[in-house]
């Protein structure tokens, strides 16, 4: 127990595999769940004072945590999940579930968020990655974000300063952490919005292996190609290392089928990259983030 952080939900030596979508990941020295910005600021101030590393995991959906875990503080925003509407502007805290946020927009007949109706993860992670699907992406509706800088300062970043690109934002370089974000939506028809979300979710269920733990889409889309198609053409569907395999349903996904480890994921990713490059000449670039220490 860290006495200076009394009252904050902090768990010591906590296995992160219980919190990741892949169901892999070693322990965090300290796993913290702040309830508000004040608690978050206290954690960061303490970590900086003690020269302890800290990072925010978000929803840990498009992420692999290595088997040795993470030193210092890991901060999860599960309890920072409020969503507010002000006219056609939706503001969500970083820990708000992305799928649930799209449902709130639908309930109020606001359009613009439909593309994200089946994307797992949090608002903070979606902004960080400029998450997208089916022709839409976060940058299309993003207004601004409040962020926490590595030094512990809170500031606001505009859409222009975020410099969005394909699965990219400026904060991937700066180390700033989203704590809330605002999005510009438009008035729409509830039934039309609902039908579009149902259509997109049906497509996702048909094409993606949602029944298994996974990190979502593993690779970025290479220019002029589709990663899944290249992997399939290299005869890698179903290829397995340890407990992790290339999905038979969608080759762009790697699923944890038998108590796989982060090392299994990393080894399979490396094997797929090498095999696809040898087969097609295209070098795939991972979309998934890999963090932490090896065993």
Swiss-Prot record:
GO biological process assignments: cell division; cell wall organization; peptidoglycan biosynthetic process; regulation of cell shape
Protein name: UDP-N-acetylenolpyruvoylglucosamine reductase
Domain of life: Bacteria
One Gene Ontology CC term in the entry: cytosol
Main location: cytoplasm
Alphabetical list of InterPro entries matching this protein: FAD-bd_PCMH (IPR016166), FAD-bd_PCMH-like_sf (IPR036318), FAD-bd_PCMH_sub1 (IPR016167), FAD-bd_PCMH_sub2 (IPR016169), MurB (IPR003170), MurB_C (IPR011601), MurB_C_sf (IPR036635), Oxid_FAD_bind_N (IPR006094)
Keyword 4Fe-4S: no
Enzyme Commission number, as recorded: 1.3.1.98
Domain FAD-binding PCMH-type: 23-188
GO MF: FAD binding; UDP-N-acetylmuramate dehydrogenase activity
